[in-house]
């Protein structure tokens, strides 16, 4: 914190506490000045203070510094107050220096307070009371530090106000006025009002640009025609009314207020022409234009002929404010009307630095602190003025750049360029308009019949979009030739009449009225095509009737006729423009709205009939209209290659996801998304082996997902035998409960040999997809059909029913040495049960969930029963009535016979991996699978589930977590895989032929 000496802030606080002491009559201390609680005037003499309290006004005055004003009688006085305040005048003291004149009461003349007090302040301070005690009609509107004050229209007085008396010489009062407190409070208010006045000035300039045509044709009298002044029409242009700021002298301004009533009414006539712009509902109260904007001209004082009174001001239908704030309310209304057209200082600021004082020049010091450009809304700083102007449009909502084809508006020129590329194909001869088009010119009609800033008539675009198929068509947005002819006749009528007795609604407010009365029945872009069509058709008649009424209203107004005639005669704009009073203004969603209406015109019948035949209930089928292509989507107009692709595309609109990942079960809408997702599952073999389910051997890439899957197994939500089906997807899982109750637990070696890897399934589906494209069969139908077919075969084959020979394709036939393995099967089962497995359950508990080692070793016939039904799907095995027997020995014999019977035919149809023994239907799938195996180093294999691992520690963790066993393991090799893969009904034990528990000395089996 700075250690510099500060300016005694305690003195200011003590000054504020002075009124409370003085009000109680405690004037014993004469060292401190006494301050009036009402007007903050300070007095050192108690007598003067008591006299002032008796005559002080009830309302505290507001003091404003007039920076550019000099006292005509005291030219040497400074324009700014001095901090010491010794030579400054006492405003309230001089006000009450003549008590006999005031009579200890406020004068009844409403113009006495503000004008006299304003002159008695020696040109340094302007006191504007918010209202007087007797007649509250007087007051001042704070315009600007350099512009003085503009009096409100007071009540009717019998005579003009008297000229102000000469101010007293400075230094009359002995005390000093406490100025810093007042100035500190007024500084913020003054800045806000300056900002409002500058915005209002820009609004007036734009309005004058539109209203200057009234002087060339002969403007009709405004609604507030002054009674008794006659029809005084002025041919003087109105633009000089808002000329650049000139020095205003208060003495001359107030002296001119005592002019005659005829000159006053003549000066008021140009201002009356724009009275309707600030009184939208046509109130009859006149006011001076300087009170709304910045008073650039000397403001004439109100004359006795003026009928404006306080009651009329308060009784106006659009102003519910006190009499002293009427003009401020008009300022707010005028600023709200033209904010959109004047909020961009970049478009209105002159480039060459000449001409009128623009908004950017006035606000320059506020927006450019320290040479940088700062936003006045969010205080963001920019390096250039152009960047600041573009940023300001985000606050004001201005879109200056307009497409000359469709009428859409954009914030920047770059956005317009991107949008205009859409019209290149349809309108190659039309060039983009790179110049900004002011939005306030959207309501002006020209002789060419095209909207301002546009090159294509809206009628032509509507005719091209219309089709003979029927539907709801939009009405033309531009007034017809008959309406224009009626407007021309009204123009001649208004010109010959000279003045209008029934003005109706003002021209500027007709535009606002048309936008407000216009029906808001357009469908949103999120509206479905069916409901949108019904909604549009339901409001078509009422919308047409409203448009016709608005058309009659607009074309019957004289001011509208003047506007039309002016721009038809001048033609001074670079782009012709036409007003669209009967339609909506173009927006960002207009093209989407036209697209929705085009879809609706193509026929609701075709969309409804096609929706019933689509794969989904909510997505419509392609329309059969001639305008759209044979494979074009009626929703997004995308053209697809074939009908099958179109049906899949409609499934995407309906939210279908037919492509399901076989690893994690996640569904996707397209096959490309499934392929991209499947890349994440192609991890190393060790990582895949760690995240496998110990019950159904389903692989997971996420350990949390695996944990949830195991919990579902334990809770009975997923059957133990139904989740490991290789094909069928969701259909196989739906039939899992039936398969588990019938077929029991399946042996994992047979499952792994039967089910192909996810890579193999993906390749098989790709091959099948090529064949199905010729037959126009969807992928989801083929997947569901194959899944349900395989599930049905496995369930029916257990009961001994006959089935097709296609069931044999779902089995695995890598049993080249099944005879040798079959002879050793009994011994393998016994040793496995004794050495590596926990005690088995009773033989009759086949329906109980078995651990992985029990299901894989086939304890008590479960192994054989799980393997036998898979082979009984062939016609030969289906005829054996012993398939339903529960005897253990009979099941084992039948399984050996079936295995011996199927060896020759199946060994040649499928390819087995030499490393892990997994079977594949084609050589290409086998080669793709072999890439996942490491080329060097031994592969440690689990003796229970035959999964391979690169490291012994990984295998140890696997056996502890999955099988809860610590058993010897051996490196995996081609000589061991023969015995492991050729026995379909059981898993190899450590005492099998070809598999040694200690294959080498440097690889101990027990850690």
Swiss-Prot record:
Gene Ontology CC annotation, any one: nucleus
Tissue expression notes: Highest levels in adult brain (in different areas). Lower levels in heart; very low levels in kidney and pancreas. Expressed throughout the retina and lens vesicle as well as the periocular mesenchyme.
Compositionally skewed regions (Pro residues) per UniProt: 151-171
Modified residues annotated as Phosphoserine in this record: 243, 797, 802, 806
Span list, region Disordered: 1-33, 59-121, 137-177, 220-243, 286-306, 520-540, 610-629, 714-886
Subcellular location: Nucleus
Primary localization class, coarse: nucleus
Bilayer-spanning residue ranges: none
InterPro entries cross-referenced by the UniProt entry: Sal_C2H2-zinc-finger (IPR051565), Znf_C2H2_sf (IPR036236), Znf_C2H2_type (IPR013087)
Polar residues bias locations: 99-108, 734-744
Keywords: DNA-binding, Isopeptide bond, Metal-binding, Nucleus, Phosphoprotein, Repeat, Transcription, Transcription regulation, Ubl conjugation, Zinc, Zinc-finger
Crosslinked positions (Glycyl lysine isopeptide (Lys-Gly) (interchain with G-Cter in ubiquitin)): 911
One Gene Ontology term from the biological process aspect of the record: regulation of transcription by RNA polymerase II
GO molecular function ontology, one term from the record: zinc ion binding
Domain of life according to the entry: Eukaryota
Compositionally biased residues, Acidic residues: 758-782, 803-812
Pfam families for the chain: zf-C2H2, zf-C2H2_6
Biased composition (Low complexity): 70-80, 747-757
ZnF bounds (C2H2-type): 34-56, 373-395, 401-423, 631-653, 659-681, 691-713, 911-933, 940-963
CDD domains xrefs: SUF4-like (cd20908)
Biased composition (Basic and acidic residues): 862-871
Associated disease: Coloboma, ocular, autosomal recessive: An ocular anomaly resulting from abnormal morphogenesis of the optic cup and stalk, and incomplete fusion of the fetal intra-ocular fissure during gestation. The clinical presentation is variable. Some individuals may present with minimal defects in the anterior iris leaf without other ocular defects. More complex malformations create a combination of iris, uveoretinal and/or optic nerve defects without or with microphthalmia or even anophthalmia.
Function: Probable transcription factor that plays a role in eye development before, during, and after optic fissure closure.
Similarity remark: Belongs to the sal C2H2-type zinc-finger protein family.
Protein's recorded name: Sal-like protein 2
